[in-house]
UniProtKB/Swiss-Prot annotation:
Region (Disordered): 612-644, 783-817, 856-928, 959-983
Family as reported in the entry's similarity comment: Belongs to the ITIH family.
Primary gene name: ITIH6
Carbohydrate attachment residues: N83, N374, N540, N594, N971, N1231
Cited Pfam families: ITI_HC_C, VIT, VWA
InterPro entries: ITI_HC_C (IPR010600), ITIH (IPR050934), VIT (IPR013694), VWF_A (IPR002035), vWFA_dom_sf (IPR036465)
Protein's recorded name: Inter-alpha-trypsin inhibitor heavy chain H6
Positions with biased composition (Polar residues): 623-640, 864-875
Alphabetized CDD domains for the sequence: vWA_interalpha_trypsin_inhibitor
GO cellular component labels: extracellular region
Lineage: Eukaryota, Metazoa, Chordata, Craniata, Vertebrata
Residue ranges with Pro residues bias: 876-888
Amino acid sequence: MSGWRYLICVSFLLTILLELTYQGPPVPASSSTKLLMTSYSMRSTVVSRYAHTLVTSVLFNPHAEAHEAIFDLDLPHLAFISNFTMTINNKVYIAEVKEKHQAKKIYEEAHQQGKTAAHVGIRDRESEKFRISTSLAAGTEVTFSLAYEELLQRHQGQYQLVVSLRPGQLVKRLSIEVTVSERTGISYVHIPPLRTGRLRTNAHASEVDSPPSTRIERGETCVRITYCPTLQDQSSISGSGIMADFLVQYDVVMEDIIGDVQIYDDYFIHYFAPRGLPPMEKNVVFVIDVSSSMFGTKMEQTKTAMNVILSDLQANDYFNIISFSDTVNVWKAGGSIQATIQNVHSAKDYLHCMEADGWTDVNSALLAAASVLNHSNQEPGRGPSVGRIPLIIFLTDGEPTAGVTTPSVILSNVRQALGHRVSLFSLAFGDDADFTLLRRLSLENRGIARRIYEDTDAALQLKGLYEEISMPLLADVRLNYLGGLVGASPWAVFPNYFGGSELVVAGQVQPGKQELGIHLAARGPKDQLLVAHHSEGATNNSQKAFGCPGEPAPNVAHFIRRLWAYVTIGELLDAHFQARDTTTRHLLAAKVLNLSLEYNFVTPLTSLVMVQPKQASEETRRQTSTSAGPDTIMPSSSSRHGLGVSTAQPALVPKVISPKSRPVKPKFYLSSTTTASTKKMLSSKELEPLGESPHTLSMPTYPKAKIPAQQDSGTLAQPTLRTKPTILVPSNSGTLLPLKPGSLSHQNPDILPTNSRTQVPPVKPGIPASPKADTVKCVTPLHSKPGAPSHPQLGALTSQAPKGLPQSRPGVSTLQVPKYPLHTRPRVPAPKTRNNMPHLGPGILLSKTPKILLSLKPSAPPHQISTSISLSKPETPNPHMPQTPLPPRPDRPRPPLPESLSTFPNTISSSTGPSSTTTTSVLGEPLPMPFTPTLPPGRFWHQYDLLPGPQRTRQVLGPSRPGVPTMSLLNSSRPTPEGSPPNLPILLPSSILPEAISLLLLPEELELLSESMVESKFVESLNPPAFYTFLTPDEDGSPNWDGNSEEILGGAGGSMESQGSSVGLAKGTLPSIFTFSSSVDGDPHFVIQIPHSEEKICFTLNGHPGDLLQLIEDPKAGLHVSGKLLGAPPRPGHKDQTRTYFQIITVTTDKPRAYTITISRSSISLRGEGTLRLSWDQPALLKRPQLELYVAAAARLTLRLGPYLEFLVLRHRYRHPSTLQLPHLGFYVANGSGLSPSARGLIGQFQHADIRLVTGPMGPCLRRHHGPDVPVILGKRLLKDSPRLLPRWASCWLVKRSHVELLLGHPYLSYVL
């Protein structure tokens, strides 16, 4: 017993000692260089469903040398970034929103000047990741502040705000504050536990408790939630910090059937979500893909979800099931049947018997579903179909591979068959589904398209999406707005309104109108007509607004105005996606750009640009280089190998990354749950061309806003980088106050925030800001006293010093904001509206993208100055350059370097060229005259080019008038040299380059392809594989090589050891565009690139005719590649040496799809979902799930297996063959990153091999892990780096024939199958 007492006493003393000495979270050994996060705060203000979130992170570098400071945040996928600031060394740097090409231009100039810069694209994913890193000097602090805005969607009866809480470490001051203000009142609010994953669960919200340290304070129209976890609370979740989502779920009171209408400052928002309506009956047809790609887990998950869905059908509903592959099977051919218990049980038995096999015939399946619905409506004796809503739920995991496969034909057939009477809801299961086609199908037929991610919760995803549309309450909803709207038709129509969702309409009323009438007409159950009328008066700013008691009311007008812009941009992007001609897409894109610049939103057409002075970079660089040892190799600031952050060079590297668990194809279009059925598609004839004349594009520029002189009171006229050093300070006024040096928040913790009456403008006018975490009082009562910290009155401006700040405190400055925005942005004029031009109806949002009242009138400010930019006619394409495009490469993970996104200029006019001009769009696409729904062929790959052609040197035509910058068009962008800055032209008048740059956030390219172009043209990939080594091509020469390598080599086989061959490269031969990681071609000659090196190994294998060689064997990746040898006549005088070529290459894959591709000298065959034969003489493109096969130029076959494996097979033929030459095949590994470390084979073993080139006692040798040294000699070899370019002499480490087996590690026979 005494021993136990002793242990207890020791444990107790140790516990006390740990409590007394505890100063922060335990730092693991691996994170010894991690910076200390002193504060992390998130503040969300929700006003009428529109949320503004500000995230602030403060990092301190306690180390003696500079270290990388990283700020990353998961953003909601429908959110727009509206502001970003960074404070380093007491200086605040404010990001600006620029047109994306202009931002790229700034990036180029800054990069060329040695300033740090980076850029990245936005992708439409379930969540976006914003990431930025910078080198932080020792003993300094950096403050990151990011603001974004979003409209909360109503799903299944509630709104949900998701805040990503991932600081990456334990933080002493960690806080979240969420304020929700709703005019009609809040009926329900719940805070579920922190969500550590995105997988769905069956747990109901009411069954779980809120996280500890959560405080909820409710008022009639306001709710405030605070979450301030202590270090112990954080440690109980994770020892390395919280990595979860904080959720707020709530619903509002909606008593009026017409909904909630709010009018502020000539902008209105209408929320339509009536309660208490009886559900309508529905006739639903489930169309389920049962092709071979659905085999296994996906089919089981589909059956599980369908069993639950069938059980949830109402007794009065009618339903049917169609399964399809390359054949279509209708469960009840006579039509839909009633959902009785017996019929549902019979349907489940039918589901149980479904098996996956065959190809995918999308067209026939949807036409069969249309036929079933039409037959059910016409069939007598099946009960009245009056008032029954026809729905099709279409589930597929692939793309059309059987029957009609042309997208435009499928769209036309389905559109005609459904007759705009049936709502089609498409579910894209997995990454291989053609989501673009499915989305078009749904949007054109009164529905939406959603993704189902291949996760363990796929069945719950299917069930959840069905629940959203399982209860139709109204059909053909028509909302008329009486009282005068601006630039839009006074009505909006929706196909359906489903229970638990919400329709949102945003628009502008005529100036001075004080009342807006709303008339509702819709169909209810049994086709009963529902009619209602409501009149809403405009709200004056002097009237009492809703909000939390005892606090200043939120500036609702400010939120409504920004909400209108958010909704409008989303609707314009949606309309852009649906537009069928290029001109309309250009005009819609121009309007998106105008609004994005005006409201400071980062959208697919704008970018975020931040400037960091060069002096700051040099200071950090000097400090770092000083801390480095004398023997340390420091990278140069002008290194061409990228913008990665190191201890020698400060850099900001923002990234937008999505979780790998739920990959989605890169699109940034916003989808909507319901589309306005009467919305009319704009055509080129209905919209005016850009500019004042059909040959020019008029682009306005703005003069810089004048900066008032600094006031005596100490206020700063404008927060520019030239002012005195400032830092962000917490304030309950909702602003970021610039302070003078020395007034740091951690040095002066007693700085008092402004009180509730203080109104201080935000740094960015028009953008609501929020205080830092320091000001969040987790115990502050809802009814606070005057003078206590409270919410800001957002958007209010003042030129006086805040009363809440003590005047006696020195060094505190306030901010005075001019009338116009600090950084006036150029606007692209939208076409003016004519009286006879049709308007789009008021848009509505149901659950996704809102439908808005589109206005085609420009809203340029009075100080706008127009400039005209003209372009010369695009030059005539080279007749030697073929014109058939290559399909785009599959999406691969983007490397951290921004060069993979860069492109080269396209057609730049010559000073001596024709004087005619071509109109261009804001996206760099020329608008041909007359306007046609096509794009110039320069945007696409050429027919006989597996790789993009060389860039030709051109000159830029001078400006048409003094002071106007020139423009250039984008070419089919080919990859740029690794590490080099992109060479993009500016497409809008560029502003003066700021003093420095560090952040450039660029969105994904917004393609403007017409529907027909999407089918026949393939835009080049902007994601070149990381292993490509890009070189700058010569200016002369012609890449017209026909693939006859041995003609170039000067004889059959082309001895690789003959350095002194008299046959050299022809004059003008271009260097390579990329280097293959490994290849085998010729005798056969093997060329292997040493991993992580630029060096190559060359060797020849003495094979035997008829042998089947194992080239790649990777069971883990499910890949097997073999080659069969063909005998060839020996060289004169070398009859003892056998010569062989490859005559057949066989590629077999069983993961994730089972395919066998056999390539011979005469044909190509594919076995998978059936057998298909292709001819070398017929160019062909074949796309299957996880497979792309492209035959081009009768000599090249590109084979892609998923995103990480790509091979090239060349067929060599000779016009005038000698007795030594035979037709044969060559095999090249273009992308082998998908091979596992366990890969074997003559080529596969080298992909991840631990092999190095060293200098031994006997000279250079190759050293492999646990292997003998292999002697090599440095020679030259004619290497073929590109399928369309001539071979070139290149250095190669030659392995003698007698040492080849020593290099391989096994005898030759071990590789013979």
